[in-house]
Regions:
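Short, amphipathic alpha-helical "lid/cap" segments that border enzyme active or binding sites
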Residues: 68, 188-196, 298-306
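A hydrophobic C-terminal alpha-helical subdomain
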Residues: 246-319
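N-terminal Rossmann-like NAD(P) cofactor-binding module of classical short-chain dehydrogenase/reductase
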Residues: 71, 75-80, 105
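N-terminal glycine-rich "phosphate-gripper" loop used for MgATP/nucleotide binding
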Residues: 81-90
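Oxidoreductase cofactor-interface core, primarily capturing Rossmann-like NAD(P)-dependent enzymes
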Residues: 2-51, 62-65, 86-87, 99, ...
Length: 319
């Protein structure tokens, strides 16, 4: 794509701005101010919570006409829809292509779905189907796509809401497969900055996977940082719960046979993908340098832990 075309990429539509990931993407665009942002919402009941200068359009995700109308004139579609709404993304992609949207960034922001083991997990079937749809649609149109993989979202994983690694209320830290394996992890703020950076590097990020991380760290290293942050708070010592991700996957498969994608099913496959060796959770290559993502060190991770453990941090993650 020529440079003069990239300079004309200005109008961005964001779906899912009220969710946790979407709220951080929204914040990044508000800080950036180089792009004109439009929010796609199911209803306008919480419109007062959005910045007044941002356009908000109510859409019907079951109506192609509604989606195409909302996306006309948009250069970029960013989806931050949560797992409960992932089935809507196929219609969003069809509408974006019909509206001649130049770049489509779907709701990924997680596991490395280029890993063949992780790619087989049934909980990622909708995302993989959408990736295939994007590849086909963009090959036959003027649209392009970017898939953003972040592996484990650090603030979510250590929050009371996520509880993937830490259960703060029980003073419990979960160690998967011994806890010595390094895994890639990314903060929610960096997810937002990455989306903006992808548009700033429009040509270099077209029709490809982007992998970013704030740090590659072991769970044991993270546990030590949690202990340092909480050392003076007067609380009890941290307990450790050892979990085998192979067992978690087995339990997820057994639960899946009962016919429902329950939280236990999602959890079992998620921890296997994020923390088990050989499942792509420790990125072999990252695109941080291309996008200007600097990453964070021990002190910054400790500041993040301190914030997430605070009342303000818990409230920010309560979407």
């Amino acid at each position: 794509m020529k440079e003069d075309l990239r300079s004309r990429i200005k109008n961005v539509a964001l779906a899912g701005a009220t969710g946790i990931v979407g709220s951080y993407i929204l914040a990044a665009f508000c800080q950036n101010k180089r792009y004109n942002l439009t929010l796609l919402v199911r209803d306008k009941s919480n419109i007062a919570s959005f910045p007044p200068h941002i356009t908000v359009i109510q859409v019907d995700y079951d109506s192609n006409e509604s989606l195409v109308s909302a996306l006309r004139g948009q250069d970029v579609l960013v989806s931050a829809l949560g797992k409960a709404a992932l089935h809507c993304q196929g219609r969003l992609v069809d509408a974006a292509v019909a509206a001649n949207v130049r770049r489509i960034i779907p709701s990924e922001f997680g596991a490395n779905l280029r890993n063949p083991k992780t790619r087989k997990f049934p909980t990622y079937a909708l995302k993989i189907s959408l990736e295939n749809q994007l590849a086909r649609s963009c090959e036959l149109s003027n649209s392009s796509y970017t898939l953003i993989y972040t592996n484990c979202l650090l603030d979510w994983a250590i929050s009371s809401r996520g509880a993937l690694l830490v259960d703060q209320s029980k003073r419990l830290f979960k160690l998967y497969d011994g806890g010595n394996n390094k895994f890639s992890t990314t903060s929610l703020a960096t997810v937002g900055h990455t989306v903006v950076a992808v548009l700033d590097h429009f040509e270099a990020t077209a029709n490809r996977v982007i992998c970013v991380q704030d740090a590659a760290i072991s769970q044991i290293e993270l546990l030590e940082l949690v202990k340092e942050v909480t050392a003076g708070d007067g609380g009890q010592e941290w307990d450790v719960l050892h979990i085998d991700t192979g067992d978690a996957e087995t339990r997820a498969l057994a639960a899946l046979k009962q016919g429902a994608l329950t939280s236990e099913v999602f959890y079992g496959f998620a921890v296997r993908a994020a923390f088990a060796p050989g499942y792509g959770g420790h990125f072999a290559h990252c695109d941080n340098e291309l996008l200007g993502i600097k990453g964070i060190g021990r002190d910054e991770i400790k500041r993040l832990i301190r914030h997430v453990f605070s009342e303000d941090g818990q409230q920010a993650l309560s979407h």
